Amino acid sequence: YIQNQLFREFAFGDFRELTKRVTIDPAMLIYLDGYVSKAGNPNENYARELLELFAIGTGFYKDGTPHYLEHDIIELARALTGWTPDRLSVRFNPASFDKSVKTIFGKTAGFGIQGKAETDVIDYIFEQIDKDLQKPRSAVFLCTKLYQTFVHHEPDMEIVTAMAQTLSDNNWSVKA
């Protein structure tokens, strides 16, 4: 029920905020093993799904470099430690959070989420630029999925690029 309400609240709102909320949602923490992800023993399940299915997408740029590396998944998993379901809500346990610096997409920082570190890792993911289209990669990824779902299975990248620009220009608001 709670996760369903979360999706309803953000369905046509801020996609970046939805991503932040889903990341620490009790149902998601249980479903993808985030609740067992602790400093020194991070679980990579959600980190992998976040990049692959929700924010970046698998694949390669025209120059042959991948959208992300295995190392990025490992470091992202470390940034997502410390959260655990607490009945119908969620609790942050500082003792379970990996406080050390992480290197994700080539940047080294104290990554975490929800104000628990110097750099919000979800904001950082959404700042990544698609090397081929020079637009935020997450916007290109989401807009490609929307185009394929509602228009045609073969995306027109000129239209997708314009959609991605609109999405990022409007603070990740899907209804824009």
Where do the language-model regions lie?
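Active-site substrate-binding loop specific to GH73 endo-beta-N-acetylglucosaminidase modules
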Residues: 1-176
